[in-house]
Regions:
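Short glycine-rich phosphate-binding loop at a beta-alpha junction
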Residues: 5-6, 84
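Pocket-lining segment of extracytoplasmic ligand-binding domains
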Residues: 28-121
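Secondary-structure end/capping motifs
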Residues: 91-161
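Hinge/capping helix and adjacent helix->loop/strand transition within the periplasmic-binding protein
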Residues: 1-5, 13-28, 92-93
């Protein structure tokens, strides 16, 4: 039996489905809900669970410790990032200002690279210089509507009962 750390009813739950379908393991795969990525990384370092979904820079930190990638969300062909505003009253001016600021940040990060922001990454993500140097060249996308194929995949996942 294998145990995967992920978050239920989320992108990592959907991606776990894709990975299990692709890998066709002999034994049952159990999903445990570990929402905090920092906790997942510590569990990986302590060999507590078989597989984990990690975002950057935690994924870079895990790879530095000779762990293996068995499935990458980048290879799944699905784009699940979203900015959601959940207010009872739409605040279009504030939403537009947020989108403009977000898109400016994306332009700056894509222009300068994530490693340019090493001090911020180290401060808020609690990683060292070696981890920052190991980060891949990540390119971010601006705010835009979701792709129809991604909406359909998410809808099918949520309504299928897995």
């Amino acid at each position: 039996d294998k145990i995967v750390a992920m978050t239920r009813y989320s992108a990592t739950d959907l991606l776990t489905n894709l990975a299990v379908r692709k890998g066709k393991p002999k034994y049952q795969v159990f999903r445990v809900q570990i929402n905090d990525v920092m906790v997942r990384l510590r569990m990986l370092q302590n060999h507590e669970i078989d597989a984990y979904w990690l975002a950057e820079p935690q994924a870079a930190k895990a790879l530095q410790a000779d762990n293996n990638v068995i499935f990458s969300s980048a290879d799944a062909g699905v784009h699940l990032g979203v900015v959601a505003v959940m207010d009872k009253v739409r605040r279009q001016t504030e939403e537009a200002a947020f989108a403009e600021a977000y898109d400016k940040a994306v332009d700056q990060i894509n222009k300068k690279g994530v490693k340019y922001y090493a001090d911020l990454i180290k401060k808020y993500m609690k990683v060292d210089d070696a981890t920052v140097r190991a980060l891949p060249d990540i390119k971010y996308t601006k705010i835009g509507p979701p792709r129809r194929s991604d909406l359909l995949m998410a809808h099918n996942f949520l309504t299928s009962g897995k």
